[in-house]
Amino acid sequence: MANPRHRHTPSRRDKRRANWKATAPNLALCPECKEPKLPHRVCPNCGTYKGRKILEVEE
């Protein structure tokens, strides 16, 4: 099994990790209650998806 011959410097390690950025999730507004929600998912606030009631949400 292959092993590294030389140690990589911290600057090389950090240059490689420079592209590991985490992106903020895209949010869409629920058409029913106007609360932000993840796209293509049931709204956690009102429980609707594509205009239909999917979840019973306690209010």
From Swiss-Prot:
PANTHER family: 50S RIBOSOMAL PROTEIN L32 (PTHR35534), LARGE RIBOSOMAL SUBUNIT PROTEIN BL32 (PTHR35534:SF1)
Biological process according to GO: translation
Any GO CC annotation of this UniProt entry: cytosolic large ribosomal subunit
Pfam entry (one): Ribosomal_L32p
Family matches, as NCBIfam families: rpmF_bact
Record keywords, A-Z: Ribonucleoprotein, Ribosomal protein
Source organism superkingdom: Bacteria
GN (gene name): rpmF
Gene Ontology molecular function: any one: structural constituent of ribosome
Name under which the protein is recorded: Large ribosomal subunit protein bL32
Keyword check for Ribonucleoprotein: yes
Family: Belongs to the bacterial ribosomal protein bL32 family.
